[in-house]
Regions:
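Interhelical loop and helix-boundary elements at the membrane-water interface
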Residues: 1-19, 69, 75-93, 129-149
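Membrane-helix interfacial "entry" motifs
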Residues: 2, 36-44, 113, 135, ...
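Membrane-embedded alpha-helical segments that form the functional core of polytopic membrane enzymes
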Residues: 20-66, 101, 105, 116-129, ...
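Residues in and immediately flanking transmembrane alpha helices
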Residues: 25, 77-80, 155
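Juxtamembrane transmembrane-helix termini
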Residues: 29-36, 70, 111, 134
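Multi-pass membrane catalytic core of lipid/isoprenoid biosynthesis enzymes
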Residues: 50, 68-121
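A feature for the membrane-embedded catalytic helix bundles of lipid/isoprenoid biosynthetic enzymes
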Residues: 95-160
Length: 160
């Protein structure tokens, strides 16, 4: 039971709920009332939301993986990786989430008959890794990157 709670803390479950609800609210309260022709069915749209949630969760995981040394000093009490979840398991979840997101993202891109859209998902995965590895220490570029990814999660709803 404690491992499940740690896992939900690692992926920041509450934040993921907010991400999903934001996409759902935009779709059903802002886009649907004004558009009649939708490429994605409701179930396919839910897959898009799932893809966003998986990529976001993997971003939280990789961020915590790269922060282990810093968290040992600054956040020893709230550190998850290296205490209740090993680095190896965290990396495994990171890979699984990204692979699932990529497969679903490619599937959705094929549905809308534009496989180039799958590059959006690849960009998001790579961008979150780059942020965690290098950009986090750069105030300007790190914040710009996070802002762009946040905007992209909203833009994707309209794009698909």
């Amino acid at each position: 039971m404690n491992n499940i709670i740690s896992f939900f803390k690692l992926i920041r479950f509450k934040n993921l709920i907010i991400v999903a609800l934001t996409q759902l609210l935009i779709k059903f309260s802002l886009i649907n009332p004004f558009l009649d022709n939708f490429i994605l069915s409701s179930n396919q749209f839910y897959l898009l939301v799932l893809t966003t949630v998986l990529i976001t969760a993997s971003g939280y995981i990789i961020n915590d993986i790269y922060d282990v040394k810093t968290d040992k000093i600054n956040k020893e009490g709230s550190r998850i990786i290296g205490k209740s979840i090993t680095s190896r398991i965290a990396i495994s979840w990171y890979i699984i989430f990204n692979l699932l997101a990529l497969v679903i993202g490619i599937y959705i891109s094929c549905i809308v008959k534009n496989t180039y859209y799958s590059l959006i998902f690849i960009y998001c995965i790579f961008s979150l890794w780059t942020y965690s590895k290098r950009m986090k220490t750069s105030f300007l570029f790190g914040n710009l990157q996070v802002s762009l990814l946040t905007a992209l999660s909203i833009f994707n709803v309209a794009l698909f």
